[in-house]
Structure formats: structure tokens, C-alpha cells
Amino acid sequence: LATASGMSAMMLSLLTICSAGDHIVASSQLYGGSFNLLRLTLPRFGIETTFVKPRDVEGFKKAIKPNTKCIFGELIGNPGIEIMNLPEVSKIAKDAGIPVIIDGTFNTPYLCNLFDLGADIIVHSLTKWMAGHGTSMGGCIVEKGDFNWKQGSKFPTMTEPYEGYHGLSFAEEFGPAAFTMRARAEGMRDFGPSMSPMNAFNILTGIETLSLRMDKHISNTAIMVDYLTNNDNVTWVNHPSLPDHPDHE
């Protein structure tokens, strides 16, 4: 589902399953806009968030409440590049019966398939690496399509009849695609964060060279890390490729 920006993709993904009185568990290492949406804006609408350090797997488990609707995070935290233990966090979410929503902007699908690591829903800011040329803004939501939304009364926006579409139940009508269809039918309609045609064209053009650009980003980064690590004027270097980084393994 293409959106006007990465933030609109994140907002739609959360508001599709969250209502006033609900709760989110989120990594504390997030893009600033994401952090403030969770910390300052959503509480005005009755949606609260508990933040957990991305390496604290047990902390994610302890933070889950009966009204928790999802776990949100970034695999590679922005800006501290702490790595979230997504496979373990995903197991915790599965045991709790809630989806894991991951912002995949930093790694792009070229470098990492987040679904293989346990994500249920992925959001991207296409503005950055995916488009690649600083010409257009955009975002997207990608649903894996195998989450069970029919868990009693846990997800009423998925299971209960929706008056906005003649009493339709999205889980019954669309099955594995229920989340995407609800986000499209309600969120896109009511909030209007549609991607413009020109931005869509520019982003698709940019994605054609994604593999070439990401390979170059990685090789350039390796050169920079090596240079800085061996420079006597540099006190410390923080990068997961270094053996002494806490998330190197």
C-alpha cells in the first residue's frame, strides 16, 4: 500500500489496529518523527506507548499488557544503529498474539527480508534509500499476510462489522489481506495520505537502481569505517561491522 510519506505509512499501520485505550510496545531507538508520534501525538488520541531498549528482549515481554495491540521497532535503530533482536522479539509477540510492525527504511528489502526474521508488517519511508535521489517523498506498507486477526475480541477493527462499509468484517471478507484492505479502505479514505503520481514514477525509477546503490553504500561504509578506526585523531567508531560492537554477532 503506497502512501505519501514514511510517517503516513507508520501512522496508518498503527491506527488500523489501535483505538483509544489501546497500548503499543516500541523500541526506544527510532527515527525522531516516529518517536514523537508515539510519545506525544498518539497519547492525545488515547493510545499509549511503552518504550523498551532494542537489545532488551525480556523488556519487550514485560512491557506487554492486555490492551497491547502490537510491537513496533526498527531492525537497525536510528540513529544509534543498535540492532533489535527481531527473531526473539517476534517469538514474544507470537506468544502474546500480537503483530510485529517493523520500519525497514534503514536496511531496505535488498539487504534484509524482515519477514524472514519475524516481522508481520513492514513500513518504509521510500523517500530515502529506495527512491535514492532526493526528488520525491513516499512511503509504503507491506503485509506478510499470515497473521491470525480472528483472535476473539483482540482486534475489533479487523473482526467486528464496520459501518463505513455496510457492516463488512475485514477479517471475514479478506482473510490474510485484512490489514491492508482496512488500511486502504478506511485510513487512506479518511486521512488521505495518497502518493502523488509523479512521486510514484520517480520512486519506481529510483528502485530500478536500488541494488547498485546499496552495494556502493555498503562498500563505501566499509572504507570509511576502516579509515576512521585507524585514524589516531578519532576517539571511537560505532558500527556493527566492528568486532567490538555489542551487536556484531
Regions found by a protein language model. Give the residues of each.
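Conserved PLP-enzyme active-site core in the AAT-like
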Residues: 1-230, 238
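Hard-cation-handling environments
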Residues: 233
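Active-site loop ensemble at the mouth of alpha/beta enzyme cores that anchors a bound cofactor
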Residues: 241-249
